[in-house]
Design a protein with these regions (language model features):
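Class I S-adenosyl-L-methionine
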Residues: 73-78, 88-296
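Core alpha/beta nucleotide-donor-binding catalytic domains of modification enzymes
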Residues: 2-119, 129-133, 137-143
């Protein structure tokens, strides 16, 4: 059994990936990974994790407060952990909106601190594409700081550092109906002297990428601030069948109550258009001046 710790767990996306596999187009549980505990500070996300994984110990706590003594007080051993997984908050690294080198951008240091006393054989660190392009306080690449911090843990005493391998992966290449790039850092503890090589399932191509239609064409159309609880048809694609599983009732199909201003913006946007197109229409007098967008839209 491989012992795993999930940091910055959110609702449990990474845990799901390690606890499940796909057989005959169905998600089935796998028994070779044991999630010893998960950590999440956001209450709603922690509650969602508890609902999704009731058998996993959830530590709802600021990660800065977690150390060996804290875990021991909770009856949790920090010894003989094989793998740490997690992706620190990504808002600061995101390419959408204003990017700031703030406290959230430095949360990888807490991840590193946890590594120093748990000393897993390996870690998986996931984050957004912006991690590769964001600058630190000295205007250098933040990714260099992150990798170097994992390479050398000598400031924590005798803790062994990690050889770090980096790769940019796009979810659309692996069966997800979303053009979503993510940076993965894999760390192997140096004393193990293991060379890591990236291996993946066969990538999808333009001919077999899963489209938005493939994913949601079985869902009813919603108006503003509306909810519907029935699928409009049987699954039309393998992807829909996989995600639906044995569920017959449609859950959480609810539209937001968008204000009139945002509705006007959405109605004005054509396929592939964004903030610059809206602003151009404002400047050309096609749209009202109050629709001009300053940040947060791409």
């Amino acid at each position: 059994m491989i012992e795993v710790v999930d940091l910055f767990s959110g609702a449990g996306g990474l845990t799901f990936g390690f606890q499940n596999t796909i057989k005959n187009n169905k998600f089935v549980s796998r028994n070779d990974f044991n999630i010893r505990f998960a950590n999440e500070f956001n209450h709603d996300a922690a509650e969602a994790f508890r609902q999704n994984y009731p058998r996993v110990t959830m530590i709802e706590e600021d990660i800065a407060n977690i150390d060996e003594h804290f875990l021991k007080s909770k009856g949790i051993s920090s010894k003989r952990v094989d793998l740490v997984i997690g992706g620190p908050p990504c808002q600061s690294f995101s390419t959408v909106g204003k990017r700031q080198y703030d406290k959230r951008a430095k949360m990888y240091r807490e991840y590193r601190r946890i590594l120093s006393f748990i000393q897993p054989k390996m870690f998986v660190f996931e984050n957004v594409y912006g991690l590769l392009t964001m600058k630190n306080e000295q205007n250098g690449p933040i990714i260099r700081n992150v990798k170097e911090s994992f390479n050398d843990l000598s400031s924590f005493g005798e803790a062994s550092g990690y050889d770090v391998y980096t790769k940019l992966i796009n979810a659309k290449d692996f069966g997800v109906p979303q053009n979503r790039e993510r940076v993965f850092l894999i760390g192997i503890r140096k004393d193990l002297k293991i060379k890591f090589e990236w291996t993946f399932p066969e990538e999808t191509t333009l001919n077999n990428e899963i489209t938005l239609r493939d994913a949601i064409s079985d869902l009813p159309i919603l108006g503003n601030n509306e909810q519907k609880n029935n699928y409009i048809c049987e699954p039309r694609t393998e992807y829909q069948a996989l995600l639906r599983g044995n569920q017959t009732e449609l859950l959480n199909h609810v539209s937001r109550n968008h204000g009139e201003r945002l509705q006007k913006i959405m109605r004005a946007l054509g396929e592939g258009q964004g903030k610059n197109d809206i602003n151009r229409m404002v400047e050309d007098g096609i749209l009202d001046k109050d629709l001009y967008l300053t940040s947060g839209y791409n």
